[in-house]
Amino acid sequence: PEVYNTAEGFVISEVFFTQMLTTEGKPYLYGQYVIITNNTDNTLYADSLVFLQSANISSLKHDYTKDFRTNSMLAGSLFMIPGKGKDVPVAAGKSIVLALNGKDHSKFVPHGPDLSKANFEIYDISTNRVVDEDQPNVPNLDRWFAKSASITVLHSGGVETYALARIPVSKETYMKDYQYDATYLFKFNTTEKVMTTKGYLVPNSWIIDAVNL
C-alpha cells in the first residue's frame, strides 16, 4: 500500500476489510473496522475528523476527462467524528475504533472481532431493502455522504483509498460547493463509453493521512 501523512499526528493504523465466513460458509462483511491512532506525544482531539472512502477502486485505471488527482481526492463516502472541539480526546499513542457495525461479531462468525466497545460506528439510512443496524451503545458517525444506496462496506479486495481529513468549511457549504461528477472514457475490447462517477472533491491540503491499497 501507498501511505501519505502530514504532521497532524492522527494516522490510519489499521483497516480490516477482509470478508469473513459464517459457520455455514456464507460471506460476512459486517465485522469491518478502521483504527485511528494518535501518533504523537501529546493528547489530540478527534472531533470533526472526517473518514473518507474513495469513489473509485484503485485497481482500475481511469482516463479522466479532467484529471483532478494532482490536487484532490474524489471521495465516495464521508463520515465525520462528532464533537465540539474537545469531546473526543485521544491520548498519546492511543487509538479509537470506527466500526462498520458496533456489535460483537464473534457471536456470528468464528474469530470475529468484538466491536461492541468501538468508539463510533457507521450507520446508513438505506433506500432499499438492505437495512443497516443501529447499535444503541455505540455512537454514530455524522454521515455526510455515502456512495452506497444501502449500507457502507469496505471493498473486501482491498482496492480502495482511505483517508482522514479536516474540512475547514461548514457541512452545508461543502456539500454545495465540492460535489463533482468525474467523467472518464471506459474501454473494453472494442467498446468505448463515457462514464461518470459522482463524489465530492477533498483538496489534498485538507488530508492529514491516506492509505492507497
State what each model feature region is:
Residues 3-213:
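Activation on beta-sandwich/Ig-like modules and their edge loops
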